[in-house]
Every structure is written in structure tokens, then in C-alpha cells.
Amino acid sequence: MRTYVSPIGYNSTSVVRPVLSRGLDSGDEIRLLRPHEESDGQRATEAIGDVERLLNEIEPDVTLTVEWITYDDYAAAVLECSEIIIGADGDVIVNLGGGARDILVPLTTAALVHSEAIATMVTFSDIDGAVRELESPMITASVPENVVSTLEAVADHVDRVSTPTLTEELDRSKSSITRHVNLLEEEGLVQTEKHGRTKVVELTFAGELYLRIDGNC
């Protein structure tokens, strides 16, 4: 099953299109985030009704829930969004588009913190109406300083680099480099693949961000 988490404003399309792009099956859940107070409740209610009607035409056995989020306290809103994400069942799909910015910003923060719990992040473009999948960086990753030097060496290469090359450049044992690369991959900072019997390593988006946070980029 899937649980979709999405803000909703007055436009049902920003919710419906991302859901349809990922699929909808019996037992799936839709959790729509709204501010706990709003100036035009009627328009919001109409948008929620449109979502429910359109999705029920496709799959009647879908649960739709409205979650009320604090809009005037950023920290409280982040924690509320956090609870929704970690309490969701199945594959969690977070839509970072639509709705009030007062809800979207806290949801984005919570989604980045809990990226390991999210199967997919998507967004609905206000410009061209396209639904795009977003790469979710593991911003909570943490590795020892001696392993960071291996990450830096990977980043020094524009393209992929082989583990034998890293062993030579860093003047370390093959077993040490293998351990470092395995740890970095577990943290989502690099990705690897085999070319024959040789493993090649490539920096990920999360790895690039990690080095910027760490002050090494």
C-alpha cells in the first residue's frame, strides 16, 4: 500500500496529478494537510471534495484524511508533519507542491529530516504542470572524519572513480577503502556499481551536500 502526504490549497490538481503519476490501489491512503485556521474554508472544502470525488472514481477503496497543521508556529508545524510522515503506513509518497507556503515549508523540512522513511518525493510544477520526482538527500548522514577524506577523494573526480584508484591516491589498504565505500553507500553519500570485477564509485547529490555542510566543498 501507499500513503500519500500532500498539502492542499484551493486547487485539487496539485494533489490529483501527483497521485495519478504514482498509481492508486485499493487500501491506499491520502493525507491532505491544511492550516488549522484559514480565511476561505469553503474553497478549501470544495478542493478536498474534488480530490475525493476524482480519486474515488478511480479506486473507491481509498482512505482520505485531512490533517490540520499549525500555520503560525514553524517548529510546531514541522513536528506535526514529522509525526504524519513517521506514522504513515506502506510506501510513503510526499508531494512538495500546492497549498499554503506556511504548510509547505514545514512539510519540506520534515521530509528532508525523514528522507530515509520516504519512498518518493514529488512536486507539481506551477510553471508547466508537470509532476517531477525529487531526489531526497540524506541530510542526517554522519561518517567519521577518516571516511570523509575518502568521500572528498571521490568528489575530486568529475565522473566515477574505481576503488583501486582510491586505494592508490589515498595510500590506504584495499580493505580500508572497501569499508569506507560501504559505509558511505549505506549513508547514501555515494553509489557504486560493478564494472567487471572492479567496483566504481560516484558521488550522490546527498554526498555533495554533505561536503558543503562539512565545509569541504
Language-model regions: role of each:
Residues 1-91, 106, 112-217:
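Long, low-complexity, Lys/Arg-enriched
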Residues 91-97:
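Short glycine-rich phosphate-binding loop at a beta-alpha junction
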Residues 99-104:
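The conserved phosphate-sensing helix
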